[in-house]
Curated annotation (Swiss-Prot):
GO terms for cellular component: ribonucleoprotein complex; ribosome. This is Small ribosomal subunit protein eS32 eS32z/eS32y/eS32x/eS32w/eS32v. Keywords: Ribonucleoprotein, Ribosomal protein. Initially thought to be part of the large ribosomal subunit. Crystal structures show eS32/eL41 to be a small ribosomal subunit forming a bridge at the interface of the 2 subunits. The keyword Ribonucleoprotein applies. It comes from Arabidopsis thaliana (Mouse-ear cress). Component of the small ribosomal subunit (SSU). Signal peptide: none annotated. GO terms for molecular function: structural constituent of ribosome. GO terms for biological process: translation. Belongs to the eukaryotic ribosomal protein eS32 family. InterPro entries: Ribosomal_eS32. Residues 1-25 are annotated as: Disordered.
């Protein structure tokens, strides 16, 4: 069960990181 929400959270974190990187550049 924990792995399921963890995978979903990881995907969201990755998307947020991409946006942050674009803002940095």
């Amino acid at each position: 069960m924990r792995a399921k929400w963890k995978k979903k959270r990881m995907r969201r974190l990755k998307r947020k990181r991409r946006k942050m990187r674009q803002r940095s550049k």
